[in-house]
């Protein structure tokens, strides 16, 4: 069953999938005893309300990112899911991207060494939204990816945003996230850029990795490059000098899979087998929202450092 207030969308869904029942009243869907689980893909401001209603109706929930608009709302939903003994999962779909998962495993293998910093670029000219700004629309992806790859959440942030298209919402944002151990991650998101870019770079002490979601030849490239200090003393260059090491560029073979399909299969498996969705549970969704709120606060304060 599908619920939407847009009559045209319901007609289109019915035309594509004649067997699917449609309704404009989401409460009718939640009241249907045949339905065990729901997927919520509404405007962000409704995520908390609809998820709370679905859990109260005894449904398992897969909610699109971000889980809610505040950390407190996220934790309330987490408590509601635990009380109802239902699965609550957040749609951080890039955690299910085959390239990103390969990068995660490669970092864990120790081949990259200590991570120095990471940066991401997620830009395009549009599409524009009017319910949330570019930060809340695009950055949840990159924050979730960094938290996943680094295995921990950011502790502070400083950010700047700009309303450059005559909009009342920020069309672009630059955010720097501080992670434990001195690691940095920089995020650039924009609706006002001439190029569509979906890239992440990881710089480590041994190797460097670039993931490009739009690269059809090879989404992941491993650069066997590094910089190290010499132990020898050089009077003309101070107490040490830096040596750069150039190596090969490797494009690993990755068995690609549709991330949305993998996400859906993971959710169904959790529901059918009573497994907790560790990869993208409410706790992780709440960390992403808390980070977003801190970034927004820093933007509102003109770039001040804000603890998360």
Description of each model-found segment:
Residues 98-120:
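Rossmann-like NAD(P)H-binding beta-loop-alpha module
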Residues 93, 206-279, 283, 304, ...:
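C-terminal glycine/acidic-rich active-site capping loop/insertion
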Residues 19-26:
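Conserved SAM-binding strand-loop segment of SAM-dependent methyltransferases
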Residues 125-195, 201, 215, 283:
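Rossmann-like dinucleotide-binding domain that binds NAD(P)(H)
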Residues 86, 297-308:
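C-terminal capping/lid region of NAD(P)-dependent oxidoreductase domains
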Residues 1-16:
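NAD(P)-binding Rossmann-fold cofactor-contacting core
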Residues 24, 63, 88-90, 119, ...:
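Hydrophobic residues in well-ordered beta-strands that form the structural core
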